[in-house]
Design a protein with these regions (language model features):
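C-terminal interaction surface of TIR/SEFIR-family domains
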Residues: 1-7, 18, 103-163
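Short, solvent-exposed loop/turn segments at secondary-structure junctions
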Residues: 13-15, 72, 99-100
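Conserved beta-strand segments of the P-loop GTPase G domain that flank and frequently precede/overlap
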Residues: 9, 66-69, 95-96
Length: 163
């Protein structure tokens, strides 16, 4: 089986450890983990720098895996990554990671599905950030993009399910 080139979207502060666990599974070939120092350097340069970093790292990736933690849906840059991926025609899928343990061995609460925040115009395939379709020509992104919610509470079982 050929490994996919993927871009991982996640809330860095809350879920970087969990994202590392998913990356280490080896099921897919993804981008190299960004260090907190690198991310802080990009953030310091402002919004345009962040957008360029995301756009560059998403290039040549065939899909985006949104690792859904407790606050992913509320994060500006996670939402930007979802919109950008859709506009670029990349596959988009979500995996709930709240039951994987973080670096301190703690699990989190389940977050909202970030795909619920977007609608797609069925005629033009245009993505817009709002929760409810404006008319019959729009569909909620959550009806298109699949999410995987491991049915386990024990972190090792969640890890095995994702694997």
């Amino acid at each position: 089986m050929i490994k996919r080139q993927v871009f991982y979207s996640f809330h860095f502060k809350n879920d970087s450890w969990r994202a590392g666990q998913v990356r280490n599974i080896g099921v897919v070939e993804g981008n190299m983990p960004v260090s907190s120092n690198d991310w802080e350097e990009v953030k310091r340069k402002g919004d345009d720098s962040i957008k360029r970093w995301i756009d560059t790292h998403m290039d040549y990736r065939s899909c985006v895996i949104v690792l859904i933690g407790s606050d992913t849906a509320s994060r500006e840059w996670c939402r930007y990554e979802i919109k950008h991926a859709w506009k670029e025609g990349k596959g988009v899928v979500g995996i709930y990671v709240h039951n994987l343990k973080n670096i301190e061995g703690e699990q989190d609460i389940k977050g909202d599905n970030p795909f619920n925040l977007f609608c797609i115009d069925k005629t033009f395939n245009y993505i817009i950030e709002h929760k409810h379709p404006a008319d019959s020509n729009e569909i909620n992104l959550s009806e298109i993009c699949k999410t995987y919610d491991p049915p386990y509470k024990i972190s090792t079982n969640v890890y095995d399910y994702i694997k």
